[in-house]
Amino acid sequence: MALSFFSGGGSASHAKYFDIRLDEDYIVFRGGEQEAASAHLSGKLLLCLSEPLSIKHIRLHLTGISRVCWHLPSSSAGGGRKSWRERVIYEKTWRFRDPGKGKTEILPAGNYEYPFNLVLEGNMPESIEGLSDTYITYRFKAEIGRKYAKDIIVRKPLRIIRTLEPSALELAHAMSVENIWPNKIEYSISTPTKAVIFGTSIRVDFKLIPLLKGLTIGQIVSQLIESHDLTLNPEDPDSIRNTYKNTRTILNDEFELDHDNALEIIDEAAEGYQFSRYLDLPKTLTRCLQDTDTKGIKVRHKLKFRVQLMNPDGHISELRATLPVSIFISPNLAIDENNNLVDQTPQSAQRAINDIAQQAPPLYGEHQFDQLYSELDPNGYRTPGPGSGPGTPFGTLSRNLSAENLASMNALTNTDISASALHSRLSNLSNLNITRPHQPSPTDHESQNDSEHRRLGVPADYFGPSSGSNSHSPSSPVLSRRPSDEVDHEHVPSGMATPFHPQYAEVETLSRVPSYSTAVRTTKTFPFRHLSSHLSKPISEMLGADLANSSLPWIFFIIGRALVTLTPLVTMMKTEDCDSFKLGLESRIRTEAASPA
């Protein structure tokens, strides 16, 4: 690099090249000061020596300065009063070479490279440049200290940009003002978004519908107004007395309608004017700043509209409206050291607009500066864990087959089923699914039926070949259901375990119908333990000896038992209803018994 970088002396024979080179031309914060993530600043300090050089130190400084100033004119000829305040808002120093106080060292000829990096917090004030006496700037200053000669110094500005996130509401919400001036005009003035990129253009959509016959639209004026609110001591609660406000017009657009060609039908009901205007923003920060509010510098923008209405009687009315606008700097439009856009073509502005509209989320590798939740234990949230293998564990190594942390799960569950019971059921279910089902042979099936008969107290030949049991194939698998006995039912409250149900094989045995000959010969008590105690009485006691010894069909035997079973239920009915019900049923049974079989 040429020696024009140097200020403060030096000769070409001592330093051939000395420069500050940044990896990125500017730092970008996305979002406000309270929500933006940190940013990484990195670069190198390059030094090239053609001959040895005696130095005291090599240092690099980064300094941020805030200055607020305004000039109040005076009525006297002596001028006005000037109020200002300047302060350092950021400082950072890198010491690459430092032999010690009062000492020097000699650098041999050659090339030297000193890397540096820094993490900048997201709440740092952004760069504000463009006003003459009010600004926030960041500058690098690299110096080579020498004992008997002037220091070699090189400077480089750093621009910090605060832009909007792609999900910001200013980019999604349209701004509009619409109303009806009675007996005058119905109007609607809108912009597609509130936020506008610096250096591009603002599209304004107009819809004007005259409501008075003979009323015509005159000149339409659109203005972009920039307001400045400056405060010397923003952190001082009494700083209202040290505040200065000022406004300036950024652009002015005047337009007149072509009444012969611009009139069209709007909303299928009325005739009016519908058109758009594009307001081109300046390409330099000296004429237009970005919206900001930091360190006592507040900048805002708004659009002001004036529409002349030519009344039929000759007088002129004026429609006035205002819309807020937010201007922000896009990192896709580079700004040089003189605060001008590097590329001022319409194509570059359109590319910046498209990039904002189609911006993707940040890359995975750019998450290292994201703010983490405090007071959150990261154990259990890292995948894989410290002791985890590269693959899914098998068998008992898996968490879903382990019994760890069941006590805490019992405290977290909101249901009546304990976590230990659920774990046991899932484990048994997994074992049942893994085990190959056994297909019983006919011999196994017969032996199982005999054991069921003995357990129920039923004779083995009670269901003979003529009974309904022959409808089941001996080779068909026996239906079974494992009772929920993994928990102690006596010590578990109601609802904590599945109720006990009889085995499917037992129910199947009870549902079989015996043969006719077996039914008429049977007068003993059948100890079916799951039936009501009323069914344990002999037939002679329930229906009488004559009816019991007669050759009744089995269906009447079932009806008689049902009569005795329903006796406790019908006691809730009236006495005469119960008597008539019993007499009618007994009369029908005797009639059927007297008829020939």
Swiss-Prot record:
Q: Which UniProt keywords apply?
A: Ubl conjugation pathway
Q: Does the keyword Nucleotide-binding apply?
A: no
Classification via Gene3D superfamilies: 2.60.40.640
**Biological processes, Gene Ontology terms:** regulation of protein ubiquitination; ubiquitin-dependent endocytosis
Q: Where is the composition biased (Basic and acidic residues)?
A: 443-455, 482-492
Q: Which cysteines are joined by disulfide bonds?
A: none
Ranges of compositional bias, category Low complexity: 465-481
What superkingdom does the record give? Eukaryota
The record's GO molecular-function terms, alphabetically, read:
protein-macromolecule adaptor activity; ubiquitin protein ligase binding
Q: Where is this region: Disordered?
A: 375-398, 432-499
GO cellular component terms, A-Z: cytosol; plasma membrane
Is Transferase set as a keyword in this record? no
Q: Which InterPro entries match?
A: Arrestin-like_C, Arrestin-like_N, Arrestin_C-like, Arrestin_domain-protein, Ig_E-set
What the entry lists under Pfam families is as follows:
Arrestin_C, Arrestin_N
Oligomeric state and interaction partners are given as: Interacts with hulA.
> What this chain does, per the record?
Component of the regulatory network controlling carbon source utilization through ubiquitination and deubiquitination involving creA, creB, creC, creD and acrB. May be involved in signaling by recognizing appropriately phosphorylated substrates via its arrestin domains and then recruit a HECT-type ubiquitin ligase such as hulA, leading to ubiquitination of the substrate, providing a link between ubiquitination and phosphorylation in protein regulation and stability.
Q: Which family does it belong to?
A: Belongs to the arrestin family.
Q: What is this protein called?
A: Probable HECT-type ubiquitin ligase-interacting protein creD
Q: Which organism is it from?
A: Aspergillus oryzae (strain ATCC 42149 / RIB 40)
